[in-house]
Amino acid sequence: MTDIVALTLNPSIDISTSVERVEPTRKLRCSPPRFYPGGGGVNVARVALRFGAGVELIYPTGGSTGHLLRRLVEREGIPNLAVDLAQETREDLTVFEEATGAEYRFVLPGPRVSESEWRNCLDILEQLHSRPKFMVASGSLPPGVPPDFYARVAKIARKLGAKFVLDTSGAALEAALKEGVYLLKPNLRELNEFLGAEVADDGAIVAASRRIIARYGTEVVVTSLGENGAILVSADKTWRAEAPHVHVLSAVGAGDSFLGAMVSRLATGHSLEDAFRYAVAAGAAAVLTPGTALCDRADVERLLPQVRIRNLEVRELAAAVGH
């Protein structure tokens, strides 16, 4: 049974390596590279599978890198449908500097996707034999894809009776919100970009989330705050989660681990609070692993008791806004 259909339009081959020190001009001798299938929806599917959810991944691939991406997805054991592209799938590079512990991320532009290619992705969604509980769209839109693409996906999700979950930014975000989103998961930077204003404290984040809910009918807004945890707002809930303190090896994929864990718990019948707790633990667990290895289920279970969730009281919110 398919609980979750995950979609990404801009997948990648994620390559991670390390070097003693990053310096200009001279050759840098790197450690043996690790290769992972990457992109928002791909990573969400990888994590959801680790949490026992039935998942299907839909993604476009092209060229020799696209062939490698398919092999990497198959290696993860993810049921998938790949749409052929004329251009090459992109690659991303993460370099860990051993001397300082700094992480450098080089993100290459995605291939141009033609109208027939992105329409093929929509056709696959519309013709799904399964009726998923959730449809997750995550990641940026590559060149050639219109900003209302995720809005079209939202419409298909509604037709299939699936709850639509979105993690993206820019014009694609607002267009999709107007069509209808069940759960929105921005990070703080993405929330600020969407608002066109700087919000930082809990009260301002909650107020912004409530405005999104009131204006667009979104049911849940979860803002991930990295090492500072996360804030969840719905029509009747305002929760603040504190993240466990962990040693950061790589922050790549923490947000995708957060979302993958949350949706998989919801899709397998658990409560919103349980899903939120697992999401925060998964985000923390992801930074313990190298590159885009994402969270390990055993690490998530170990960190879970350290996640503290509390209701944000009206007085706290008023004080934060006043401050």
Regions found by a protein language model. Name each.
Residues R50-K133, R302-H323:
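Conserved N-terminal subdomain of the carbohydrate kinase-like
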Residues K155-K159, E174, K178, D202-H323:
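Conserved phosphate-binding/catalytic region of the ribokinase-like
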Residues V22-P32, R105, D236-H247:
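Glycine/charged-rich beta-loop-alpha catalytic/anionic-binding loops adjacent to active sites
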Residues A6-L7, Y59, A82, V136-A137, ...:
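General beta-strand structural signal in soluble alpha/beta enzymes
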Residues A48, N187, G255:
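Short, conserved phosphate/pyrophosphate- and ester-handling motifs at nucleotide-, phospho-/glycolipid
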Residues R46, L93-V95, G229-L232:
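Short beta-strand scaffold segments in enzyme catalytic cores
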